[in-house]
Amino acid sequence: MISVSDKNEVKRIIHTEDWPKSELIYGNFRQNPARPTLIAFTDKKAYAERKRLISGWFGLRYIRSLQPLMQQCINESIASIERAIDTAGGIVDMQNLCTGTAVDIIGTTIFGQSFDVVKNGSHPLPDYLRKMLKASGLLLFMPWIRSIPFRPTRPAYIDRFTLDIMEKRRATAKSAPRQDLLQKLVEQLDDAAGSKFTPFDVQGEVTIMLVAGTETTANSELFTLLMLVRHPDKLRRVYAEVDAWYPPGDLATPVDCEYSLQGMTYLQACEDEAMRLVPAQATGSPRESRRDEVVLGYRVPAGTTVFPTTQGVHHDESVWKDASEYVPERWLEIYEKGKVTEQHFWPFSAGSRVCIGKHFALQEMHLMLVNLLRRFEFEYVPGQPETTVFRVAQHMEAPKYVMKVRRRKF
């Protein structure tokens, strides 16, 4: 097992040659070794088949249709901040707010029901999944744990919850079909022996979507806000852009990604710069050499797990001037020249394993950040720990991160 952070080798591994994912690592992400989820396929052909089955539901047109559902969840987050301003002096735990909102959005868009984490503070399903996430983090770096007899599998609550909601959907598929991702998965179910998409597979996919679709997006939102409150001059420029696209005080007009996502380039630059400095996938999704290779002059035997450490490349001074600094402006010229794909920048990985939910995440981030910035002023609260850890996704080690929030005055 080795780690590589050379810009050219990382690009070769994850993009140019598109090495398959590591069996040693991703074998740990399977409830049933013979039934991997999309994230855990290591066979390229089998992965391509499952991706074809699912990828159509992550098309831009369908994702745009989910905006009203996402907005409902964000409205609850706005109300939560309003309550904190009125009752808690405007001190808001933005880490848990972003995470709770992301969980509620996944619940609404996949399961057809919000988990109301922002409103109630918790829900059994995401609580169980958070424990699974910690266990997965251990397995990522200590795969030998897999060999321990009677190692715990997926919690029974998760199996019961997902199976129950799936069976209810199957029963009402014709009489009252819903327009969400779970419904589309259920429509592809096949109980026949030898089927490539069984109820077990649906359980696995929706569970992974909930985990992968919350931690990565929520932390990208949090780190973007954190970078902005650390740099008030950048924050003021973002406010000016938000106000130019959505006139101050006109909160009746909803945020619309079709209208503003591509045009609000400075906000996007702030997001990209935050994802460069603190990428969710810091280790770049572990790959495997399927033949003897040479990496940076060293022989790498077939079967070696290789961590293409994208964060190392994102911080490389030979690639990025002032690499350790938060400089959103660097992206504006990149956008203008249409050279984003040419950058050594892989927050969503690359090649055939680029994140299938990339556009879902970018839409959610845009809706969340623009909605909050239209209404509130955010202020940095010093003295808090800001160390990050990596457990499947990179996030704050501390259980909370607060900011001072005030209503904007127009």
Curated annotation (Swiss-Prot):
- Domain of life where this protein originates: Eukaryota
Q: What keyword terms does UniProt attach to this protein?
A: Heme, Iron, Metal-binding, Monooxygenase, Oxidoreductase
What molecular function does GO assign, one term?
oxidoreductase activity, acting on paired donors, with incorporation or reduction of molecular oxygen
SUPFAM superfamilies in alphabetical order: Cytochrome P450
EC numbers: 1.-.-.-
**Pathway per the UniProt entry:** Secondary metabolite biosynthesis
Residues given in the record as heme binding sites: C355
InterPro entries assigned: Cyt_P450, Cyt_P450_CS, Cyt_P450_E_grp-I, Cyt_P450_sf, Cytochrome_P450_monoxygenase
PROSITE patterns per record: CYTOCHROME_P450
Top enzyme category: oxidoreductase
Note whether Protein transport occurs among the keywords. no
**Cofactor list:** heme
Asked if the record carries the keyword Oxidoreductase, the reply is: yes
Reported function:
Cytochrome P450 monooxygenase; part of the gene cluster that mediates the biosynthesis of macrophasetins, 3-decalinoyltetramic acids (DTAs) which feature a tetramate (pyrrolidine-2,4-dione) unit connected to a decalin fragment and that have potent bioactivities. The PKS-NRPS mpsA together with its associated enoylreductase partner mpsG incorporate one unit of acetyl-CoA, seven units of malonyl-CoA, and one unit of L-alanine to assemble the linear tetramic acid intermediate corresponding to the backbone of macrophasetins.
PANTHER family in UniProt: CYTOCHROME P450, CYTOCHROME P450 12A4, MITOCHONDRIAL-RELATED
| Family as reported in the entry's similarity comment | Belongs to the cytochrome P450 family.
Query: Could you identify this protein by its name?
Result: Cytochrome P450 monooxygenase mpsF
> Native species of this protein?
Macrophomina phaseolina (strain MS6)
- Supply the source organism's classification: Eukaryota, Fungi, Dikarya, Ascomycota, Pezizomycotina
The record's gene field reads mpsF
